[in-house]
């Protein structure tokens, strides 16, 4: 892989005659730069034990082990990930070729569809932690029982993982660059360093999304702790130990992405859209309403079981009506299609 990367640097940078030259040159950077910008708000370490806020003191200076900690850090990450859509879309449009154009159309539809599920799945995280700051979210996950994957009931994590995989165009959702259908997808006409930038952006996005999953759902740089027992790394200061824990957790999700690539077949395009719009978005909305009702009932002193039962009943009825609407719409389309 390293040899292939070096080889690409010395290849000729070809630009198609029918392309929009300025946009064609700009598109790789619109994909490459956002892949690194999202890492700015991820805590890469720090001391979050015993209620600490992640600050560490190195060489007489007290600081966080992250580039920036805005109060809306998670929204920043979601906004930056949306910019990468433009890089892929413009790359296909500016190439002046049909296959890249089809790949970019697929990319825009797929990524916009799954961005909705991605953002909605985080609503329960904000509801449980009470903050949009990444350092605040990490600080709220002091033990395994407080990890958001447990506190939110696993479902938001599963939705986020599926939506993130689709957002990254990773298998089994890699319809943007399906070789059997689109030759190489949106980057078919690219070569040399610009081609390498797209692949570097894809791999870096996988690392960034894995780090974001760990930060939001698995305690980030927090060590593994259960019922007061902390799994320490001997002879390592707390500030550096957090970095080691973050790196180890990220490696687990990188392994999961490689495992998914090797085991699952590619989805059909209609299956991809149905999963996003008919399953993930309703599920994330329904789960958010359920968690919100439970927390409201707890604050008001209501019976949690009764509140949960009523919420599940209402959500189940709503989902049944939604499925009925889908079936009626499908029958109408079939009837209209049979007229021609």
Each language-model region and where it sits:
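Selective transmembrane helix interface/packing segments
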Residues: 1-340
């Amino acid at each position: 892989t390293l040899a292939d990367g070096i080889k690409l640097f010395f290849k000729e940078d070809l630009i198609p005659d029918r392309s929009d030259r300025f946009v064609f040159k700009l598109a790789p950077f619109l994909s490459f730069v956002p892949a690194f910008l999202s890492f700015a708000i991820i805590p890469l370490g720090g001391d979050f034990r015993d209620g600490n806020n992640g600050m560490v003191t190195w060489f007489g200076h007290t600081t966080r082990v992250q580039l920036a900690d805005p109060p809306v850090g998670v929204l920043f990450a979601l906004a930056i990930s949306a910019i990468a859509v433009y890089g892929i879309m413009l790359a296909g449009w500016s190439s002046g070729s049909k296959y890249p154009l089809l790949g970019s159309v697929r990319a825009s539809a797929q990524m916009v569809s799954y961005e909705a599920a991605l953002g909605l799945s985080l609503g329960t995280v904000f509801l449980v932690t009470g903050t949009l700051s990444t350092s605040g979210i990490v600080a709220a996950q002091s033990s395994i029982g407080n990890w958001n994957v447990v506190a939110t009931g696993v479902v938001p994590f599963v939705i986020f993982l599926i939506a993130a995989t689709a957002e990254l165009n990773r298998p089994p959702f890699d319809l943007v660059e399906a070789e059997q259908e689109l030759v190489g997808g949106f980057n078919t006409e690219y070569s040399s360093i610009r081609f390498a930038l797209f692949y570097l952006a894809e791999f870096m996005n996988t690392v960034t999304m894995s780090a974001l999953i760990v930060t939001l759902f698995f305690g980030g740089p927090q060590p593994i702790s259960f019922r007061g027992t902390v799994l320490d790394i001997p002879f390592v200061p707390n500030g550096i130990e957090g970095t080691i824990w973050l790196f180890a957790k990220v490696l687990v999700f990188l392994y999961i992405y490689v495992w998914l690539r090797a085991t699952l077949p590619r989805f059909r395009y209609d299956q991809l859209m149905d999963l996003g719009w008919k399953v993930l978005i309703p599920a994330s909305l329904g789960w958010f309403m359920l968690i919100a009702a439970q927390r409201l009932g707890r604050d008001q002193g209501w019976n949690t079981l009764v509140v949960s039962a009523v919420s599940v009943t209402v959500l189940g009825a709503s989902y049944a009506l939604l499925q009925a609407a889908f079936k009626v719409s499908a029958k109408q389309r079939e009837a209209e299609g049979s007229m021609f």
